[in-house]
């Protein structure tokens, strides 16, 4: 059975960064789409399921943190990685508090990006497996409760 390739949405107003990231991530076997604005990113995220969004902190029509909040509301399982050229502890803390799963500094180190993407995909898989285990456990518990209820009825 073929496992679908993970999908990544790159959100950055710098066309050269979008192109380089698209080329490298596609070469690693990922399905990649990109957006230059928050509006375009929101439309793409609503139309398709992405495993990961790489979000620039500064976009022409919004901030990465605002976009992060918006995406988190509609796509809570999508992993969100903030990319910034503004090395500030305040930016990092704010992004993480608003739901970023990771934070990468520019200039971009491709090894760091690939490692972070793989790490976030693994966490996504682990969360999905945990959710499935919890669901199975709930169903088994409910089945036992129903069975006990039937046995105790006259």
PLM feature spans:
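Two-component/phosphorelay signaling modules centered on CheY-like receiver
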Residues: 15-33, 120
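The feature encodes the CheY-like receiver
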Residues: 18, 60, 84
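Acidic catalytic/metal-coordinating carboxylates
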Residues: 37, 63-66
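Short amphipathic alpha-helix used as the core "switch/output" element in two-component signaling
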Residues: 43, 65-77
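Active-site residues of response regulator receiver
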Residues: 56
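CheY-like receiver
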Residues: 123-154
């Amino acid at each position: 059975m073929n496992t679908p390739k993970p999908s990544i949405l790159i959100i950055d107003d710098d066309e050269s960064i979008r192109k380089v990231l698209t080329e490298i991530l596609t070469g690693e076997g990922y399905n990649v789409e990109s957006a230059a604005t928050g509006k375009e990113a929101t439309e793409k995220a609503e139309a398709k399921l992405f495993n990961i969004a790489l979000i620039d902190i500064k976009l022409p029509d919004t901030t990465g943190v605002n976009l992060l909040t918006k995406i988190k509301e509609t796509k809570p399982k999508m992993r969100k990685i903030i990319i910034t050229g503004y090395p500030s502890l305040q930016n990092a803390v704010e992004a993480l508090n608003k739901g970023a799963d990771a934070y990468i500094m520019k200039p971009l180190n491709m090894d760091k990006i690939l490692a972070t993407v793989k790490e976030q995909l693994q966490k996504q898989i682990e969360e999905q497996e945990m959710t499935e285990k919890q669901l199975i456990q709930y169903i088994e518990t409910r089945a036992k409760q129903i069975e006990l209820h039937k046995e105790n009825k006259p």
